[in-house]
Amino acid sequence: MKNLLLFLLACSLGAAAAARPIRGSVKCGGKPMGGVTVTDGYTFAQSDEQGIFTLDADDQALFISLVTPSGYLAPLDGGIPQFYRAYDPAAKRYDFELQPWPGSGECYELLAIADPQPKTEEHFRRLRSEVMPALQAATDNGRTRGSNQAAIVLGDIVWDSPELFAGVKAEFAGLGVPVYGVIGNHDHDLNKYTDREATENYRRHFGPTYYAFDMGRTHYIVLDDIVYHGAKKYEEQIDTMQLRWAAAYAERLPAGSRVCIAMHAPAMKSWLGNRVMESAERLMDAFAGHELHFITGHTHLNSNYDIREGVTEHNVA
């Protein structure tokens, strides 16, 4: 009995040690911002009226990130909004600065781009000469009309060629709009054999593989629905950790919110008799009571599907 009690105590202490308290601030123009949601990818906190937040960060966390509020934008680095900081267990403080994004509180345009996936320098040349001019024309047109714009790249940013991440990222940065990334199956490193290791190159360039931000009246959630097993073997599912995180986030939203979940592989497989991935079913259950949209890539087709009452998928070529 004594040994059992010692074992239970050790387990309890181990569980307590799995989270480390951190502190930080959220400001805009040097002024505190209250009510901003902060997450380590496991749990959530919120900044107070002084812009201060405290969070028990999980030891397995990779990033501390903000849910950028509507009407605001994190500073850009290479076109990527810096709403995140890499988690360092030795660091106790994480400070964030946002900037106003006038006009985006109600009206904005989102450029959804899927599967550019260059594999060779020739592919990259074609991306630069054929695809980017059309995207640049769209963003230029938006600026002429005074519309705020952002872009989201829905995975397969490259085709098993992580050495091209920097070049592709630079091309999208040239659009002059914030660019949000989604990881695809071809964005995983073929030389790695665990999902965490295989996403390292992607994370270095684009940040977290799952996160959230607000634009207009829509709550955007980006998820990684590729469970990678190495050597090009993967499952199209959302892992349990992300499902728990997303479900906890759903509970923080006002009833009847408009939610858009961005991921690479479609939630519904029209070519498999409209089969819906099991983890997407669980996700839809978690967001019941909200207006839910999926925006996905992977198929190289443009399609719209009503999956169930109040749930629509927009699959982008």
Spans of features found by a protein language model:
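Short, acidic Ser/Thr/Gly-rich low-complexity loop/linker segments typical of extracellular
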Residues: T39-D56
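Beta-strand-rich domain onsets/edges
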Residues: C11-P21
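Short acidic, glycine-rich surface-loop motifs adjacent to enzyme active sites
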Residues: A250-W271
